[in-house]
Structures are given as C-alpha cells and as structure tokens.
Swiss-Prot record:
EC number: 1.8.98.2
Keywords on record: Antioxidant, ATP-binding, Chloroplast, Disulfide bond, Mitochondrion, Nucleotide-binding, Oxidoreductase, Plastid, Transit peptide
Gene field: SRX
Function (record text): Contributes to oxidative stress resistance by reducing cysteine-sulfinic acid formed under exposure to oxidants in a peroxiredoxin. May catalyze the reduction in a multi-step process by acting both as a specific phosphotransferase and a thioltransferase. Required to switch on the antioxidant pathway to regenerate the oxidative damage. In mitochondrion, catalyzes the retroreduction of the inactive sulfinic form of atypical Prx IIF using thioredoxin as reducing agent.
Protein name in UniProt: Sulfiredoxin, chloroplastic/mitochondrial
Species of the source: Arabidopsis thaliana
Major site of localization recorded for this protein: plastid
Reaction catalysed by this enzyme: S-hydroxy-S-oxy-L-cysteinyl-[peroxiredoxin] + [protein]-dithiol + ATP = S-hydroxy-L-cysteinyl-[peroxiredoxin] + [protein]-disulfide + ADP + phosphate
SUPFAM superfamilies: ParB/Sulfiredoxin
Length: 125
C-alpha cells in the first residue's frame, strides 16, 4: 500500500482519527472542538435510512464513474447524514451511496450532523 501525502488547510490540520470503541461504534474523524459541529464517520450502509430514495432515480453513468473513481482513489467527499435519536438519515450523496452498494463495500464515509425530528421533517418536505 502506498503512502499518501496531502496538504491540508490549517483549519483541518488539528483533525484526528480514532479506532472504534469496544461497543462497536464506528471509527470517527473529528476536530478538536469537543464534539461541536459535524463529525466524519465510517457507517455501515445498512445503518443509513434513505427516505428520498423512492422518489428519485440516479444517473447510472454517474454511478459507474463514481465506482471507477472509488476503486482507484477511494471516496473523496463524505455523504451528508442527519442523526435523529440514534437513527441515521442520508439526504445527499445518492450516487456515492449507490456506487458503494454496487461495489459491495460495507461502509461509507459520512458527515454526520445531529438533528431533531423537526429537522428531519424539514428535509422530507
């Protein structure tokens, strides 16, 4: 496996990665802000509910291009997920999510924001 060097903006240089806890929580990438704001987490695909999936269809050419890209360089942009009462709802990244499914990947990188039921209702309008 090759080593990868990247230049990060100063605002991202304080991020750290930690392994999953003994209770099976997913690995977390977070800032030094004490848990305020979104977290980047690898979540199992089956833990993410996709409430808008039935109302939209994905461009299969875009899904194929993303599959090729993910195979070569991995997922570059996490999908956005809202956590409400311990349940994860995905509202962006439909093509990236489907590409992960078709590749048989068990997890996907997510940017998680905590939300309320009212936030969830707002996204479903």
């Amino acid at each position: 496996m090759a080593n990868l060097m990247m230049r990060l903006p100063i605002s991202l240089r304080s991020f750290s990665v930690s392994a999953s806890s003994s209770n099976g929580s997913p690995p977390v990438i977070g800032g030094s802000s004490g848990g305020v704001g979104p977290m980047i987490v690898e979540l199992p695909l089956e833990k993410i509910r996709r409430p808008l999936m039935r109302t939209r269809s994905n461009d299969q050419n875009k899904v194929k291009e993303l599959m090729d890209s993910i195979r070569q360089i991995g997922l570059q942009v996490p999908i956005d997920v809202i956590e409400v009462d311990g349940t994860y709802y995905g509202f962006s990244g439909c093509h990236r999510y489907e590409a992960h499914q078709k590749l048989g990947l068990p997890t996907i990188r997510c940017k998680i924001r905590k939300g309320t039921k009212e936030t969830l209702r707002h996204h479903l309008r």
